[in-house]
Structures are given as structure tokens and as C-alpha cells.
Amino acid sequence: MSPLPSVPSRCRAVIFDWGGTLTPWHSVDLEEQWRVFARQVHAEETQALSLAARIIAAEDAAWVRSRTDHSSARLHEILAEAGLDADHLRREAALAAYREFWEPHTFTDEQVKPLFEGLRERGARVGVLSNTIWPRDYHRGVFERDGVLGLIDADIYSSELAWTKPHPGAFRAAAAALGVEPSEAVYVGDRPFEDVHGSQLAGMRAIWVPHSQIPVGQQVSVDEVPDGVAHELIDILGILDGWQSP
């Protein structure tokens, strides 16, 4: 058997976005998630819909800030802004219903495990950098459930940073967690603004995965062109092999 090709020495790590990249893109009713949550807090529908509307507004504002000034947010902050006390008796039941709503949309793409294994066989470290309001433990639980957590060398979530993508600081934090310079890393994601523009701004190469039907309100036009395009996740191995030095 011939030896596996090596990833170029300049590429020591490949870092992935999560939603829409490592998970297949799903169109989700983003308002219904909070109605499901709020109905666990309030049995009376009018009260539940009022709470849901406040949470929707708080979350929308957080994501607008993410796109404009690239500041991060956390789930507990959004709930507090909507007026739900941290010690509310129904809070945990509501969070359980919210997680159950999201579970079908969190399953890891079946190509991820062989992709991660192929990267590690080529000597590349594997990382994750995701814009998220959810805590680290939630995401790691998803990866563990799907049998890929042990293949990830470092994972960083905006909920534990001051910034979101496309801020260069988020990408630098991911590179540092992997022990590489940004110039030695490749970033893979489905969003031209957050993922392609942001990673290139930080000094990384970018591979775009055009899987996602991103809502118009979340789109930001960019001039940057990705260094590679992967229509299937497993295609990333071939792209990296093609970047080998002669």
C-alpha cells in the first residue's frame, strides 16, 4: 500500500464550524424553539407566548450584535434579558424541552468520522470553532453521542469568548488551542462572512462548504473568495492533498 500523502507543512490543523458544516443544514423554526421552551414555564398560553416573544427579541438582538460588532452572547444572558430568573422552578424543564426540540438538528454528518480520521492520519490536528450561545458541555455531549469527540484535538465556542466569528480573535483562539499559528491552519465553514471572510482575515486559508440555505437576514456580502470549495465534507481530504508542495 502506498503511503498517505502528507498535508503541507504550512497546514498543521484544520478547524471546523459546527452547525451547517459538521451537521447537515436544517431549516429550523427559530420562533417555535422558544414557544416550546416558554410553554414549560407558563401553562397559560398568553403568558407563554409573551415570554417567547421576549426571548426571541433578546436572541435576535444578540445575533445582530454578533454580525455588527462581533460580540458574543450566552444562553443564560439571553434568558435573563427576557426576564426569566435563573432560579425559576420551571427553568430546567423548559431547557430540557428546548434541547429536545433541537436534538434532531444536531446529528453529526456521517462523513465527519472518516474525514477526521483521514486528517489525523495525514498528521493534521482537528479543531472546532463555533458561533453559539450554548455552553461547551452541550456541544461536547453532541460529539460524544455521535462518536467523534475523541477525534477532536481542541474545540472553542464563542459562548466562552468575548468575540464571535468573523472577529480575528476567535480564529486566533482556536489556533492557539491547537498549538499552531493561524497561517498553519485551514478553516472550514458554510458561511461566506463568518467563516470565509473571518478566517482569511485572521491569516488562515478557507474552505467553503456550500450546504446551507442561510436566511437573507443573516447574510452579509463579502468580496473574499474561498481557497477551496467542498461540496461533500470528505472532499476536504482531496483539497488538502492537492495543496501539497511539489
Residue positions per predicted region:
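Asp-based, Mg2+/Mn2+-dependent phosphohydrolase catalytic module
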Residues: 1-16, 43-46, 113, 117-120, ...
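N-terminal helical cap/lid subdomain that shapes the substrate entry/recognition surface
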Residues: 2-122, 136-137
